[in-house]
């Protein structure tokens, strides 16, 4: 299985697919999925290619989810080899997307091929959900496929997202949830004027500063057994004309919450507005919700993945909800059990990204054992 997984990963990496472009990656997958009897549904949204492929019609349905788009390469001269010319050296496969996440997608395919070959009449169903819009704004990708499935009441029982979750060893960490992400664009209004005549102006930066300090020092919640406390962070502050003798007329603050299940979108919004109002600011605040938090407690899927990892690697994985958002936040809307499991993540989005060849050897077996646990039960 290793040589096949490695070869498929190389084929996918060789397809230059900066977000939101797939550049033929999904057609490579479709060719192999059709040979296994999968029904293929291409769902194109704008420039984004999405794939929903399913084998079987019965429950339970286990889905493997991933993305074929990759982040920009950065300066090409800093790569030891071309990012889209996959090269294996010193036990590592180098190329953009090797770890995030074309290696996982290759492992999806070869694990399913092995499982179907051994168990052609298995119970339940297997699906693949692949998008080319995960690394970008993620508005025409997985979320659109989920909308299609939800509209026809096609629900998923278990989902494994192939995000590179491992840290030091393959399988040492799996994500059984993620925090939500809520962003705000705050514009505090003042009165522009000459900096030598502050009594004739209102400096919005000075007016906003106490409220910003209060927001930065607020304890939003204490978290819970699954999530750390909610955080509030400023990403950008912009005010002024660029001149040194002009008090600006307004200041704009971009901020973001990463929040746990201990808080809600509504409660966070209300508290922010309460603080701003208490400081008597004239302001405009626009919100953008990028996803609610989700959590998969211990149960069939977590137990099956844990057992598979232990069988293949001999280690006990850590359950974690740390890190950024993933497409799991969309899938959780139609699937009660979602986990993320993939190769080591030390070089994702970096120059000279790579995946350990040993991870490509073991990961398909972990996925296959998970399918056996969930689909072969009496």
UniProtKB/Swiss-Prot annotation:
- What's an example GO BP annotation here? L-arginine biosynthetic process
Task: Give the reaction(s) catalysed.
Answer: N-succinyl-(2S,6S)-2,6-diaminopimelate + H2O = (2S,6S)-2,6-diaminopimelate + succinate
Binding of Zn(2+) 1 occurs at: 67, 100, 163
Which Pfam families does this UniProt record tie to the protein? M20_dimer (PF07687), Peptidase_M20 (PF01546)
The UniProt record gives the binding positions of Zn(2+) 2 as: 100, 135, 349
GO terms of molecular function? acetylornithine deacetylase activity; cobalt ion binding; succinyl-diaminopimelate desuccinylase activity; zinc ion binding
Note accompanying the cofactor annotation:
Binds 2 Zn(2+) or Co(2+) ions per subunit.
Catalytic machinery residues: 69, 134
The cofactor required is:
Zn(2+); Co(2+)
Q: What is its EC number?
A: 3.5.1.18
Pathway listed for it is: Amino-acid biosynthesis; L-lysine biosynthesis via DAP pathway; LL-2,6-diaminopimelate from (S)-tetrahydrodipicolinate (succinylase route): step 3/3
Annotated InterPro entries: Bact_exopeptidase_dim_dom (IPR036264), DapE_proteobac (IPR005941), Peptidase_M20 (IPR002933), Peptidase_M20_dimer (IPR011650), Peptidase_M20A (IPR050072)
Gene3D superfamilies tied to this protein: Zn peptidases
The protein's UniProt keywords, in alphabetical order, are: Amino-acid biosynthesis, Cobalt, Diaminopimelate biosynthesis, Hydrolase, Lysine biosynthesis, Metal-binding, Zinc
Q: Is the keyword Protease in the record? A: no
Family annotation (NCBIfam families): dapE_proteo, PRK13009.1
Could you give the subunit structure recorded for this chain?
A: Homodimer.
Query: Which purpose does this protein serve, as stated in its record?
Result: Catalyzes the hydrolysis of N-succinyl-L,L-diaminopimelic acid (SDAP), forming succinate and LL-2,6-diaminopimelate (DAP), an intermediate involved in the bacterial biosynthesis of lysine and meso-diaminopimelic acid, an essential component of bacterial cell walls.
Family the entry assigns: Belongs to the peptidase M20A family. DapE subfamily.
Name listed for the protein in its UniProt record: Succinyl-diaminopimelate desuccinylase
């Amino acid at each position: 299985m290793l040589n096949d997984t490695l070869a498929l990963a190389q084929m996918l990496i060789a397809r230059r697919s900066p977000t939101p472009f797939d550049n033929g990656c999904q057609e490579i997958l479709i060719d192999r999925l059709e040979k296994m009897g999968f029904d293929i549904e291409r769902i194109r949204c704008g420039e984004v290619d999405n794939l929903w492929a399913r084998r079987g019609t019965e429950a339970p349905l286990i889905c493997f989810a991933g993305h074929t788009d990759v982040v920009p390469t950065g300066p090409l001269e800093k790569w030891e080899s071309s990012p889209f010319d996959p090269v294996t050296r010193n036990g590592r496969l180098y190329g953009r997307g090797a770890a995030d996440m074309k290696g996982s997608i290759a492992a999806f395919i070869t694990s399913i091929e092995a499982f179907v070959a051994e168990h052609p009449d298995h119970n339940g169903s297997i699906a693949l959900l692949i998008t080319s819009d995960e690394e970008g704004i993620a508005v025409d990708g997985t979320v659109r496929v989920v909308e299609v499935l939800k509209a026809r009441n096609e629900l998923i029982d278990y989902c494994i997202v192939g995000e590179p979750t491992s840290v030091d060893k393959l399988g040492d960490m799996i994500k059984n949830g993620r925090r939500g992400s809520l962003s705000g664009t705050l514009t505090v209004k003042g009165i522009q004027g000459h900096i030598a005549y502050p009594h004739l102006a209102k400096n919005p930066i000075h007016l906003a500063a106490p409220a910003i300090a209060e927001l930065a020092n607020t304890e939003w919640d204490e978290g819970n057994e699954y999530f750390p406390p909610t955080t509030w962070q400023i990403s950008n502050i912009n005010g002024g004309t660029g001149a040194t003798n002009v008090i600006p007329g307004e200041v704009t603050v971009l901020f973001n919450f990463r929040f746990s299940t201990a808080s809600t979108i509504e409660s966070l919004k209300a508290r922010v507005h309460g603080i701003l109002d208490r400081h008597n600011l004239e302001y405009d605040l626009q919100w953008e919700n990028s996803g609610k938090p989700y959590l998969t407690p211990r149960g069939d899927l977590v137990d099956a993945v844990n057992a598979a990892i232990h069988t293949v690697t001999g280690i006990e994985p850590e359950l974690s909800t740390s890190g950024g958002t993933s497409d799991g936040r969309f899938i959780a809307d139609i699937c009660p059990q979602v986990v993320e499991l993939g190769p080591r993540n030390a070089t994702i989005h970096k120059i000279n990204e790579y995946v350990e060849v040993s991870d490509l050897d073991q990961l398909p077996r972990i996925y296959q054992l998970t399918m056996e646990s969930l689909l072969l039960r009496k």
